[in-house]
Amino acid sequence: MTMNNPNLTMIARNWRDLIRPKGISIDAESGTQFYAKFTCEPLERGFGITIGNSLRRVLLSSLQGAAATAIRIEGALHEFTTVPDVVEDVSDIILNVKEVVFKAATPKTYSVRIDREGPGPVYARDIQLVEGLSVLNPDHLIAVLDKKGPLSMELTVNVGRGYVPAERNKTPTMPIGTIPIDALFSPIRKVNYTVQNARVGQVTDYDKLTLEVWTNGSVSPADAVAFAAKILKEQLSIWVNFEESEETSYQAVMSDDEPLNENLFRSVEELELSVRSANCLQNANITLIGELVQRTEQDMLKTKNFGRKSLKEIKEILANMGLSLGMKIDNWPQLLERWKAQQAQA
């Protein structure tokens, strides 16, 4: 279905008349590789919770990351055992390995090793990396050798999303002694959001959304939010059952067979508005109805002393004329001059 008839154009006002946020601001002072605070305003009442909660859930559940999914330690057949000359038992080593932050360039399976002799600590930087895989917390402790050792282990690293239990990481081709481990692939550590009142002109019942995002460093908070928004957009697009052939707008064309709406050239004084609304238009230097209809609701609400009551009044009067706020009139100055010239010749 294509939006190219008056009924669908009217329906389009369901979303085009809603106020849209000015943009997203990021707190530069507190922002790091791992944390950022985003602010988005103004939003329609209730949209702060709707958008904030949706982004939070997608951020926590649906972004891809890399994590260790299996480990094989020489001398250990299962996780409930110990390794000679190693302070930690196998269970503790596995817990430490799960906290290593990997970053993968491509979504595939990586196999890496650690071969270390003691005495001394074994860090994430001791992992013998392969092309396309990096470690973002190289100083993370994996184990401690209290004697000469050695400690030899092989790690399997995969790319995925969300939490995957150890049972699902087990494959039939795993060598004997390989221990599948549960993996948390998500690069997101924590997400918080708050909603406060926002002001547009004299109206204070809009929403201001503040979103805080913590990551493990494999993706920046800004990119993480962008990915989450893209996921939501892709999932919601299937619900739109029509296409817009072009941006729905009011094309003002002056011709003999299709005369322009004469109301556009009337003075706003003829609208017989309340004193408050009329004064607001006067303060905004709006003298003609054609100038008024080209203003959006957001523009009008930014006008001093202009509130929801005045907005409702103007919208109702314009609707009775077949007009509305937010119209686009091509070449308005030229059309106005042509109309004045025609009136002078009449």
UniProtKB/Swiss-Prot annotation:
Keyword Nucleotidyltransferase recorded: yes
Catalytic activity from the UniProt record: RNA(n) + a ribonucleoside 5'-triphosphate = RNA(n+1) + diphosphate
SMART domains in alphabetical order: RPOLD (SM00662)
Membrane-spanning segments: none
GO CC terms: cytoplasm; DNA-directed RNA polymerase complex
Enzyme class: transferase
Alpha N-terminal domain (alpha-NTD): annotated segments: 1-243
Top-level taxon of the source organism: Bacteria
Gene Ontology biological process: DNA-templated transcription
One of the Pfam families matching this protein, by short name: RNA_pol_L
Keywords from the UniProt entry: DNA-directed RNA polymerase, Nucleotidyltransferase, Transcription, Transferase
EC id: 2.7.7.6
SUPFAM superfamilies tied to this protein: C-terminal domain of RNA polymerase alpha subunit, Insert subdomain of RNA polymerase alpha subunit, RBP11-like subunits of RNA polymerase
Stretches for region Alpha C-terminal domain (alpha-CTD): 260-346
A single MF term (Gene Ontology): DNA-directed RNA polymerase activity
NCBIfam families referenced in this protein's UniProt entry, alphabetically: PRK05182.1-2, PRK05182.2-5, rpoA
Family named by the database record: Belongs to the RNA polymerase alpha chain family.
Domain description: The N-terminal domain is essential for RNAP assembly and basal transcription, whereas the C-terminal domain is involved in interaction with transcriptional regulators and with upstream promoter elements.
Subunit structure: Homodimer. The RNAP catalytic core consists of 2 alpha, 1 beta, 1 beta' and 1 omega subunit. When a sigma factor is associated with the core the holoenzyme is formed, which can initiate transcription.
Function: DNA-dependent RNA polymerase catalyzes the transcription of DNA into RNA using the four ribonucleoside triphosphates as substrates.
Protein name: DNA-directed RNA polymerase subunit alpha
Organism for this UniProt entry: Sorangium cellulosum (strain So ce56)
